[in-house]
């Protein structure tokens, strides 16, 4: 009898341990809620009301916000991105879009965010994107990467069209990151670049991997004093004669009414992912949250 009771006790104890293990496994396998970052659960929540264009390049060239549509890809392919797949550039690749919505055309302030993975190049400047202008060689807005002599730095040049009268040509009003302000350690790995222009304060900011770059006043307030307006600020953006949009090339790659590209005008050869345009200048917290969320594939 004692032996029988002992066997029962052992059997009961074994069953209890097994059930306890099952409970433990179930608890371990239950989804763990994401911790909010900067008050957001995912990247699309950041300044959601101000996101006017978004390209994730998950096997498509479409803008999920439909701010820029009618895309035609030339030699477009994809590779692994920071989040899903990414646009893979080459010496002959670009994407041309035929339709640009008023939400993009009429931007007064702007933030452009993108992830890029690229290598050093020579021979000219690679265009990341461009908002063309029919009668202006430089277009309305663009970002490009100049060739450089260092494998750890990037010479980024941004051009933004200003609110001007027809008699004044502000072509060539570049923000240039070179010399002491060159962007360092940019090649060979994924980097998030975010730049913004605040039309209210006429100030420019740039961030790399969620961190704001400290810029001299000559750059951050590049547009704070307009000599043609008695030293007043340049003010809000004023894109005009907008026709089409291009990723990975220049407006000159689109044909008429633009001429053929100059020899230094190079297609972007790196990877690009999560390209976004906002109609406001994002705050430091918003940029930091966007970086962390996208890096976390959220």
Set out the residue ranges of the language-model regions.
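Generic low-complexity, intrinsically disordered sequence content enriched
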Residues: 12-13, 217
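Small-residue (G/S/T/A) turn/hinge positions that recur once per unit in extracellular repeat modules
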Residues: 74-76, 80
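C-terminal motif of bacterial Sec signal peptides marking the signal peptidase cleavage site
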Residues: 16-20
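Positively charged n-region of N-terminal signal peptides that target proteins for export
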Residues: 1-4
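Extracellular glycan-associated modules
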Residues: 22-69, 82-298
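Sec-dependent N-terminal signal peptides
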Residues: 6-11
